[in-house]
């Protein structure tokens, strides 16, 4: 059956609650400084799995039971966000939808780019994710061949990418009866709060003036322009589209070789590919000036002492990388290396007595950088490393054959975002780059031979 004629039939929709009640002394979870820094947003992803020959079909009842046990260990995720500062761990649970799809998995995976709004049918409802304080929502879609698609939304309230992957790896380890975790262990939500204590909640009026000190020098007749800039309110009329490109292992090796310099004699795979994507994107710009990227960096190993790798929270900070748009590839690499190398210092500042001032100072630097490049040339490169665990979410069917970090709509939160995922090809490790960019920029890349020499369209 063609994907255009497929039907996703909802079999059941329910709320999965923890298998055991959360102890009374853990019923109120106060978010850390790092959690407080970020406004909750809804993050989508869908993972596609083939059913290997000889492997039993998904046992939906066991999935529900293991998810219930997992929520006991990750108890704040079954609660409700009361504010930007507190989660009430009331065991209300998370939405769980079971659905059947009347076509083959392979036909959908081969035709992802033509699904359009049908991709949304694989996802659970978004209702209550922000306004209702729900942390996660899950939908399991079983195809006629026995393969399945596992789709979720999360709100980033108290989980970064590593925490989200750990949540799902815990669940799948229980389901597949692997021994990574003991069933009733409580996961570590305390390390991040101890390392990065929260700051007192602010009233909304106190948050508004953050950018007023960043106004440019006053010039006669430019009050309106100044107001526009200082309010961080840029207007973009262009249509944002999503595309995926593969950068295979051979191309990665060539980019590393091209990135070598005295300043960075041994660039990493990630540095070389990120610099290549950044340089390629800004090459579409017809104006000179500055550009910037934000790169989420895991702070767990950068804290003194380091935090456990399975500690839960938004334990990351964005490395702010700035450059002139006309820089060479090795110069982009050097900027990336330099900014990431400073993240240990940020971790130290956020742990000190002046952590609130440090948080505000970093935010002001970000706003200033965005203003300097007029917002248009500000990007996010978000790495989904294999080490973060997303490609290791294994229900006993093996690792996913495809990961798609979007539903049917490219929203404003994804604008100018590049999600960089590792994959294994016949020659080694490569990258898949999901790019959410202005349509004009995508068209430029799709017709640029210098870009296509290293990247091949995949969606």
From Swiss-Prot:
It comes from the Eukaryota. InterPro entries: CAT-like_dom_sf. The active site is at residues 156, 394. Pathway: Secondary metabolite biosynthesis; terpenoid biosynthesis. One of its GO terms (biological process) is saponin biosynthetic process. Belongs to the plant acyltransferase family. Mainly expressed in flowers, flower buds and young leaves, and, to a lesser extent, in old leaves, stems and roots. It comes from Saponaria officinalis. Soapwort saponins possess anticancer properties and are also being explored as enhancers for endosomal escape in targeted tumor therapies. They may also serve as precursors for vaccine adjuvants. Keywords: Acyltransferase, Transferase. Pfam families: Transferase. Component of the oleanane-type triterpene saponins (e.g. saponarioside A and saponarioside B) biosynthetic pathway, leading to the production of natural products with detergent properties used as traditional sources of soap. An acyltransferase that catalyzes the transfer of an acyl moiety to QA-triF(Q)RXX to produce saponarioside B. This is BAHD acyltransferase 1. Its EC number is 2.3.1.-. Monomer. GO terms for molecular function: acyltransferase activity.
């Amino acid at each position: 059956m063609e994907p255009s004629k497929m039907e996703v039939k909802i079999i059941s929709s329910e709320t999965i609650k923890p298998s055991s009640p959360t102890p009374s002394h853990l019923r109120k979870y106060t978010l850390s400084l790092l959690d407080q820094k970020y406004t909750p947003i809804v993050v989508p992803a869908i993972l596609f799995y083939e059913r290997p020959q000889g492997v039993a079909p998904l046992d939906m009842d066991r999935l529900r039971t293991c998810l219930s046990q997992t929520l006991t260990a990750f108890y704040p995720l079954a609660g409700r966000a009361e504010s930007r500062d507190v989660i009430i761990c009331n065991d209300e649970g998370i939405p769980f939808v079971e659905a059947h799809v009347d076509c083959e998995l392979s036909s959908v995976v081969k035709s992802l780019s033509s699904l359009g709004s049908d991709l949304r049918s694989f996802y659970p409802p978004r209702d209550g994710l922000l306004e209702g304080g729900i942390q996660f929502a899950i939908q399991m879609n079983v195809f006629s061949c026995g393969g399945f698609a596992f789709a979720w939304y999360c709100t980033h309230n108290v989980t970064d990418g590593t925490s989200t992957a750990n949540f799902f790896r815990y669940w799948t380890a229980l389901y597949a009866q692997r021994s990574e975790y003991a069933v009733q262990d409580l996961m570590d939500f305390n390390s991040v709060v101890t390392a990065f204590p929260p700051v007192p909640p602010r009233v909304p009026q106190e948050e508004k003036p953050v950018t007023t000190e960043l106004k440019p020098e006053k010039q006669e007749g430019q009050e309106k322009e100044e107001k526009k800039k200082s309010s961080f309110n840029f207007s973009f009329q262009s249509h944002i589209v999503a595309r995926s490109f593969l950068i295979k292992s051979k191309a990665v090796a060539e980019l590393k070789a091209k990135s070598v310099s005295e300043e960075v004699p041994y660039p990493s795979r990630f540095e070389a590919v990120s610099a290549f994507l950044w340089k390629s994107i800004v090459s579409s710009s017809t104006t000179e000036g500055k550009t910037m990227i934000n790169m989420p960096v895991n702070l767990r190993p950068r804290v003194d002492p380091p935090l456990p790798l399975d500690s839960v929270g938004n334990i990351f900070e964005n490395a702010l990388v700035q450059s002139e748009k006309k820089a060479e590839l090795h110069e982009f690499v050097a900027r990336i290396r330099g900014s990431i190398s400073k993240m240990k210092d940020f971790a130290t500042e956020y742990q000190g007595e002046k952590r609130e001032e440090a948080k505000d100072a970093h935010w002001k630097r970000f706003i200033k950088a965005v203003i300097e490049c007029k917002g248009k040339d500000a990007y996010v490169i978000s790495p989904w490393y294999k080490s973060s665990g997303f490609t290791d979410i294994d229900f006993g069917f093996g690792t996913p054959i495809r990961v798609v970090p979007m539903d049917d709509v490219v929203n404003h939160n994804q604008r100018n975002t590049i999600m960089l995922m590792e994959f294994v090809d016949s020659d080694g490790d490569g990258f898949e780059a999901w790019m959410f960019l202005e349509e004009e920029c995508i068209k430029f890349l799709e017709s640029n031979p210098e870009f296509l020499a290293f990247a091949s369209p995949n969606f």
